[in-house]
Amino acid sequence: MASFVSFLVLLLAALILMPQGLATYYKPIKKPPVYKPPVYKPPVYKPPVYKPKPPVYKPKPPVYKPPYKKPPYKKPPYGKYPPVEDNTHA
């Protein structure tokens, strides 16, 4: 019985010493986040990036070519026998 009484005394002391008792665990109060203004950073100078421009398409100018004279060509007579000078079968 003495152990039961000492258990009750310890339980009562624990309940008195703990402000919330055995009801809930400690939960911190939720606070809204504190607004922090952004840190000012001076602008950093960056040199412009050099990008070569693609070449513009320009057609080459025409090259002058002197007129070409073809050698004369004798047309064979149509529907007739070849001339005597070209006939080698005679």
UniProtKB/Swiss-Prot annotation:
Cell location: Secreted, Cell wall
Region (Disordered): 46-90
Main location: secreted
Chain intervals with Pro residues compositional bias: 46-65
InterPro entries: Pistil_extensin, Proline-rich_CW_protein
Keywords of the record: Cell wall, Developmental protein, Repeat, Secreted, Signal
UniProt keyword annotation of Lipoprotein present: no
GO cellular component terms, semicolon-separated: extracellular region
Signal peptide annotation: 1-24
Family affiliation: Belongs to the plant proline-rich protein superfamily. ENOD12 family.
The protein's name in its UniProt record: Repetitive proline-rich cell wall protein 3
Gene designation per UniProt: PRP3
